[in-house]
Structure formats: structure tokens, C-alpha cells
Amino acid sequence: MDADAPAGYRDPSGRHGAVTLPARPEPVAFDADATVLIVVDMQNAYATKGGYLDLAGFDVSATGPVIERIARAVAAARAAGIRVVWFQNGWDPDYVEAGGPGSPNWHKSNALKTMRRRPEMNQRLLAKGTWDYALVDALTPEPGDIVLPKPRYSGFYNTPLDSMLRARGIRTLVFTGIATNVCVESTLRDGYHREYFGIVLADATHQAGPPALQEGALRNIETFFGWVSDVAAFEAALSSDEARRIPA
């Protein structure tokens, strides 16, 4: 491999032109047909006032622009033929999937702790079929998209994500969504350990907690696990002549 070539996955057959995306810590290349855009947990629970994060005391006031930028990333991906994967985090209405006191999730999940502290919230937070669990109105899956429920922070845990990606020859995962420092980072890390290239579009993500957690998560990702870019760069890369080139 050329030492000056950008990082990332390129089809070794040379049949497809690799897209080069400006990113930190260095530019990263990917093939559109070996890439998915992952939208992590853009549910009312995480992005809307009155949802779980808001009720648990987290600030969701800045999620509006994030939703708009995710919509742009989704539109750019679809126009380039990149499949979109949507995650929804939560459990069955009886919370069997959440685990009981023998599970660390029972002790650490802020949703479960909020419901124990406020019994009137029981079966309202992150329960499948509820408003809290639903995706925000501004973001809607389309036919051909993949929608996956997940019971823990990582999208690889107890889901068919890995097998679905491998069946389609996917090597690069582009991430958007909430929360950067929890489910986004957890899924990207798990992907890294499964040999996927992970890219985060930073301005299409939002942290759970103070802004320092966003900065820390992105720094951690770019230093150890993947690459960090933004929506405008993603749009520009996909609309470039390079992205449209398919060598004979």
C-alpha cells in the first residue's frame, strides 16, 4: 500500500472509485458500495423534550440542528447509493430484555433508574411501541433501509448487524446520532474490533452530558478507533467527480 495513500477501505479489484473524505487524524477513503450510514438512536427518548434523556436530567436543547444535519447526511447517502441503517434502543414493555438486578444494565441504565425513582414513568421510557421509543418525526426510514432494535449501548450486541453487513460486503461504517459518548462510541468500538472502518460525522452527533464528553469521545475515536469528519465534507465527497467515477 502506498504510504501516502489515505487510510480506509478501497476495493482491491479497482472496479469502483474510492471516495476520499477529509477527516481527523488524516483523510480516509471508502467505497460507497462497501459503506453504510448508521443513524444511532434518533428517538424521542434521546432527542426530544419530554423524552427519557430530558426526564433523566440531560440537556437535549441542542438536538434540533443535529437532527437537521442527520437528515442531510441521510439524503447524501441515499443519493450515492449508500444504505442507511437505523438503530432504536429499548426493550419490550415488560423490560425483560433490559435485564434484572443480575445485569449491570439494570444498575447503570439511567432510564431504568429514572423509572424506579419515578414509578409513574414505568413502561413509558424506551419501551417498544411508545412515543419515547419512536424515531423523531423529522427522520423517517424508507424502503430499502435497515431498521434494527438494540437492547444495549452497542449496535453489535444481540443484533444481526454484523451478519447483515458481511452479507453485503460492507467494510466502512459512517456514524451519526445520539449519544456520541455512549451508543455511538460503543458501536464504533465494537465495529473496530470486527475489522470495520469507523467514521463519525461529528456535527451530526450529540453527547449525553456536558460538552466536554462530546470532545472527549471524538478525541478518543480519532486517536484509537476511527476517524472524525463532518456532514459538509461528507456531502462534498459524495458529490465529487471522484465519487462518481467507476473505472472500466
UniProtKB/Swiss-Prot annotation:
Top enzyme category: hydrolase
GO annotation (BP), single: uracil catabolic process
Keyword Hydrolase in record: yes
Reactions it catalyzes: (Z)-3-ureidoacrylate + H2O + H(+) = (Z)-3-aminoacrylate + NH4(+) + CO2; (Z)-3-ureidoacrylate + H2O = (Z)-3-aminoacrylate + carbamate + H(+); (Z)-2-methylureidoacrylate + H2O + H(+) = (Z)-2-methylaminoacrylate + NH4(+) + CO2
InterPro entries per record: Isochorismatase-like_dom (IPR000868), Isochorismatase-like_hydrls (IPR050272), Isochorismatase-like_sf (IPR036380), RutB (IPR019916)
Sorted UniProt keywords: Hydrolase
Pfam families: Isochorismatase (PF00857)
EC number(s) reported in the record: 3.5.1.110
Signal peptide: none
Catalytic center residues: 41, 150, 183
GO molecular function, one term: hydrolase activity, acting on carbon-nitrogen (but not peptide) bonds, in linear amides
Gene3D superfamilies: Isochorismatase-like (3.40.50.850)
Classification via NCBIfam families: RutB
Function: Hydrolyzes ureidoacrylate to form aminoacrylate and carbamate. The carbamate hydrolyzes spontaneously, thereby releasing one of the nitrogen atoms of the pyrimidine ring as ammonia and one of its carbon atoms as CO2.
Similarity remark: Belongs to the isochorismatase family. RutB subfamily.
Protein's recorded name: Ureidoacrylate amidohydrolase RutB
Gene source species: Methylorubrum extorquens (strain PA1)
Lineage, opening ranks: Bacteria, Pseudomonadati, Pseudomonadota, Alphaproteobacteria, Hyphomicrobiales
